[in-house]
């Protein structure tokens, strides 16, 4: 039987950036091959650093998919754990080591007997940086294994062990990266009339763009426009010719995201025109679409977990964090949910350390749900 805690600790020590998960893939394949030995209803494919494990059903009417992400983050770990990251500047700070371990545990249980329906276990690379789910879909990595329904989870530090949370609508926001560069004319600080100050123009933009959310977004729907980087100038007595802004747009529907993207671009171009300078606007959303649960499937999943002993089901509000599972759910009906890990530190924090008793709870809950779906 798979040692869940040791498996998680092994994976925790080898975090890798998206599409560079070579050691992770090798470790996963080794475990998967041991679990599937002698199971003639199993097929395995790889796609770059990703893995697909397909269980052929005995009387299939549909394919049920379970997706887990496998990449780490460029973070220096500060947990002090004896099994801390062995890769300098890399850490599983988003719980993907937990996600992988739970998926392996569920695979082990699913292999106990051939399912009626097909089951697909997807070990997806590059959730954090390149929207690996979108890359796999666009490259036809699924082929005829593409699920009819897709499910997945994400750990959540502020939920207690034993708590599962989701809803029948949107769970995660769609996210869009924004880069804006104003190009004016540099000059001496004493002669501003001979220059065209990009810093001033960019400052006007930062204040004016706040009106996009307050005046263009339905307050019931909500959206976020945040700029976390503002770079301009090199010294106190020189007017800079360029100013660079780097930020993010987040919205709970794709229509709202597109509206906000359009308005941010329009405001930037309007400010540039007012200051008689050039502007470059780069909007990059890629595969980070809103994670929109299928209402009927979500209700089914919620009812199932609500009746499970040891599980506290929570009907939760959407989060403005992003997840590339949204792209796959835009192609295939499915559901994502949160799994509580009771950590005082947030996701992406260098001291984030989930409670390991969650592993057995997660495997028991998810595997029982997948067995139900596979038997329908």
UniProtKB/Swiss-Prot annotation:
A Gene Ontology molecular function term of the record: N-acetyldiaminopimelate deacetylase activity
InterPro entries per the UniProt record, alphabetical: AcetylDAP_deacetylase, Amidohydrolase, Bact_exopeptidase_dim_dom, Peptidase_M20, Peptidase_M20_dimer
Pfam families: M20_dimer, Peptidase_M20
Entry annotation: catalytic residues: 69, 128
Alphabetically ordered keywords of this record: Amino-acid biosynthesis, Diaminopimelate biosynthesis, Hydrolase, Lysine biosynthesis
Catalytic activity: N-acetyl-(2S,6S)-2,6-diaminopimelate + H2O = (2S,6S)-2,6-diaminopimelate + acetate
EC nos: 3.5.1.47
A GO biological-process term: lysine biosynthetic process via diaminopimelate
SUPFAM superfamilies referenced in this protein's UniProt entry, alphabetically: Bacterial exopeptidase dimerisation domain (SSF55031), Zn-dependent exopeptidases (SSF53187)
Pathway: Amino-acid biosynthesis; L-lysine biosynthesis via DAP pathway; LL-2,6-diaminopimelate from (S)-tetrahydrodipicolinate (acetylase route): step 3/3
Residues making up the signal peptide according to the UniProt record: none
UniProt record similarity statement: Belongs to the peptidase M20A family. N-acetyldiaminopimelate deacetylase subfamily.
UniProt function note: Catalyzes the conversion of N-acetyl-diaminopimelate to diaminopimelate and acetate.
Name assigned to this protein: N-acetyldiaminopimelate deacetylase
Species per Swiss-Prot/TrEMBL record: Streptococcus pneumoniae serotype 2 (strain D39 / NCTC 7466)
């Amino acid at each position: 039987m798979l040692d869940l805690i040791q498996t998680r600790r092994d994976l925790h020590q080898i975090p890798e950036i998206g599409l560079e998960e070579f050691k992770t893939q090798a470790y996963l394949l080794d475990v998967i091959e041991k679990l599937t030995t002698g199971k003639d209803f199993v097929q395995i494919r790889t796609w770059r650093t990703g893995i697909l494990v397909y269980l052929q059903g005995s009387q299939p009417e549909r394919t049920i998919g379970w997706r887990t992400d496998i990449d780490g983050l460029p973070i220096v770990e500060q947990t002090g754990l004896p099994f801390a990251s062995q890769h300098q500047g890399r850490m599983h700070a988003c719980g993907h080591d937990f996600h992988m371990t739970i998926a392996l545990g569920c695979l082990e249980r699913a292999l106990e007997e051939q399912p009626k329906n097909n089951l697909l276990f997807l070990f997806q690379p590059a959730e954090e940086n390149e929207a690996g789910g979108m890359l796999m879909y666009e490259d036809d990595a699924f082929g005829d294994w593409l699920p009819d329904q897709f499910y997945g989870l994400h750990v959540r530090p502020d939920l207690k062990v034993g708590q599962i949370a989701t809803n029948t609508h949107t769970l995660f926001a769609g996210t869009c990266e924004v880069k804006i560069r104003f190009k004016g004319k540099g000059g001496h600080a004493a002669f501003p009339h001979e220059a065209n100050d990009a810093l001033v123009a960019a400052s006007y933009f930062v204040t004016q763009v706040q009106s996009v959310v307050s005046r263009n977004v339905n307050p019931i729907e909500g959206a976020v426009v945040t700029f976390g980087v503002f770079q301009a100038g090199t010294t106190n007595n020189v007017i800079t010719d360029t100013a660079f802004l780097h930020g993010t747009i987040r919205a709970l529907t794709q229509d709202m995201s597109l509206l906000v993207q359009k308005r941010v671009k329009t405001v930037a171009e309007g400010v540039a025109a007012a200051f008689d300078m050039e502007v470059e606007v780069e909007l990059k959303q890629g595969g980070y679409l809103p994670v929109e649960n299928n209402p009927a499937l979500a209700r089914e999943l919620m009812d199932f977990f609500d009746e499970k002993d040891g599980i506290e089901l929570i009907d939760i509000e959407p989060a403005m964090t992003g997840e590339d599972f949204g792209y796959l759910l835009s192609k295939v009906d499915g559901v994502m949910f949160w799994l509580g890990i009771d950590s005082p530190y947030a996701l992406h924090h260098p001291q984030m350390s989930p409670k390991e008793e969650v592993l057995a709870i997660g495997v028991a809950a998810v595997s029982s749900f997948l067995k139900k779906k596979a038997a329908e």
